[in-house]
Amino acid sequence: RQLYLDWIPQIMYNHHQSGPAGSVVAGPPYRDPFNHVYDPLVITTLDAVGAAMSSRLNLEGKPGYTQRNGSVFSTWFNGGLRTTTYFHNMVGILSEIIGSPTPSEVPLVPARLLPNGATPFPVTPRPWRYADSIAYSLSLNYAVLDFAARNRDALLFGIWRMGRNSIERGGRDHWTHYPRRIAAIQEAHARDNPPAKSGATEDDDSGASAAGRRRIPTRYFDDVLRKPELRDARGYILP
């Protein structure tokens, strides 16, 4: 009630612990694939807030932020404080940070030492104190608040636009694309166009390899993905 009826925030941030070994903190953007039932603006705004968080740490010389495939966190668990917000067109943030009142060390994890898209600024093995975790958490708070202050109009318009999108979707036929339905397009095309039995190899452009690379006619989109029985429900009537 407090979150969804009284406050109705545009961003909700949940601090949690602990982060993956060899990193300091895991946060957004989260790993692919994201839950494809969400409005795409939820995901892109989530990415933007995540970029502000990691950039703030980098600016302050605080390494160890990991994202996407650098952690196990996704947008698929529907029972958490952070993930339920997505169904209300809010940007739910979860960060998982290392540290506790007991001093510890950042362990050596060789696979995390090379900078990449998941961990642009790797942390090296070092002693870790609870004060370090608090300093990182404060920086992340300021990053989110600064982003919200600088993008106030965009966030307010965005949550309105997402709500409007939901209303419009409820007034017309709509289909959600699921992996199994995407695979059904390829299966239907393969059934209708079996590869030639000419002894062709994968490197032979005249045989099965070339058939697999041929463009699939757009009629398969309507035939498979736009079946009336696969339409999203416009509402549910409970007795």
Residue ranges of model-derived segments:
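Active-site/substrate-binding loop(s) of hydrolase catalytic cores
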Residues: 1-46
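Soluble non-cytosolic domains of exported or imported proteins
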Residues: 40, 44-48, 128-135
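Loop/turn elements at helix/coil->beta-strand transitions in domains of secreted/extracellular proteins
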Residues: 7-11, 54, 63, 88-91
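Acidic, glycine-rich loop-and-strand cores that form catalytic or ligand-binding grooves
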Residues: 49-57
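Hard-cation-handling environments
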Residues: 59-239
